[in-house]
């Protein structure tokens, strides 16, 4: 996904007005180690970093009709977020599991701690009306039975249109 995003930026008729850094970090589950290192030791001056958008563990099992932007209520990025969602015909949903405190448990939080506006954007659970599956249940079931197990492999269902939308 990140390579596709990079290729998309590369193919733009005009380059973005600002540089785009695509960083792949690791060790989130071990305490946000990779993102903390990058946020602490960026490859450019920290004051030149205007935003961080984190994509982690996207669920592309079904069509996407909404997104959940963790940290939006604490960020100055709500205006461009709303414009992008509107452009993609996506609704913006609230944190479906506030008790999990995902805002402080994901890589974007390393940037928040350094004063860099950041969002962690996940696909929500709303999907097309003809989908008979309650995605809030099925996605959570996948997470508890498949995620980080030997079954978490490339044979998973994958909705390419959902990936393109995300």
Language-model features, listed with the residues they occupy:
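Alpha-helical metal-binding/catalytic segments enriched in His/Glu/Asp
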Residues: 1-32
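Metal-dependent peptidase/peptidase-like ectodomains
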Residues: 25-131, 136-137, 143
